[in-house]
Every structure is written in C-alpha cells, then in structure tokens.
From Swiss-Prot:
It is found in: Cytoplasm. CDD domains: Prefoldin_6. SUPFAM superfamilies: Prefoldin. Binds specifically to cytosolic chaperonin (c-CPN) and transfers target proteins to it. Binds to nascent polypeptide chain and promotes folding in an environment in which there are many competing pathways for nonnative proteins. Required for positioning of the mitotic spindle. This is Probable prefoldin subunit 6. Disruption phenotype: Abnormal locomotion, abnormal morphology, slow growth, defects in distal tip cell migration, defects in developing gonads, and in extreme cases embryonic lethal. Belongs to the prefoldin subunit beta family. Pfam families: Prefoldin_2 (PF01920). Heterohexamer of two PFD-alpha type and four PFD-beta type subunits. One of its GO terms (biological process) is protein folding. It comes from the Eukaryota. GO terms for molecular function: protein-folding chaperone binding; unfolded protein binding.
Amino acid sequence: MADMAKFEEEVNKLRTLEKDREKYFTSRQEMEMRLTESKNVKAELDLMESDSKVYKLIGAVLVRQDLEEARSTVEKRLEFIDSETKRVEASISDISKKCTEQRDKVMNMQKSFQMMAQAAAQAQKK
C-alpha cells in the first residue's frame, strides 16, 4: 500500500506540473497578443507626421502626448514584452522537461505494478 500512496503522490506531482505548464502557455498567448497589438501601434505611429497629434487614454480621459514620447513608450513596451516572452519560453522549456521526467517516472511505476501483478497471478496459478 505504501507503493500505491507513493504512486498517487507522483501522479499528483505530474498533474501539478501540467497545470503549471498550461499557465505558462496561456501567459505566452497573452504576450503574443500584447506584442501584436504593440507592433500595430508602432506601425501606426511610424506612419504619422512629426506634427501629428497623439492622444493617450488614461482611465476615461484622452490626454495629449508628444509623438516622440509615444514612440519611445511603445518601443520600451516592445522590448519588455520581448524579454518577458523569452522568460516565459524558458519556463515552458524547463517545465516541459520536468513534465516529461515525471511522466516517465509514473509510467515506470505503472510498469512495475503490472509486472508485480503478473508475477502474483502466475504464482497463484502454480
């Protein structure tokens, strides 16, 4: 029975790792959406003339912003999103490796249980 408790513990570890991996995948999708949105904003800002008026939404109020300041802000946002995406990708890689190792561990335990069950069944036949 101690083996079965250990097995359940390992299965729960695997489930936890898989849930964490899904959170990272969701985070990556959100980053990709933010990146796309920011790239679109940058493209629009790049098309503007230097004397164009730019407004920034703060709460429910539109506030005038300098074009160069807006471009700089978007550029910094793109850099931040890029670094966060790299961090999330590294985390996904790490947790995927851990999931694979844990899945192998659980499968090996299952094989051991099956072999013990077969051995017990064979012993009963004799």
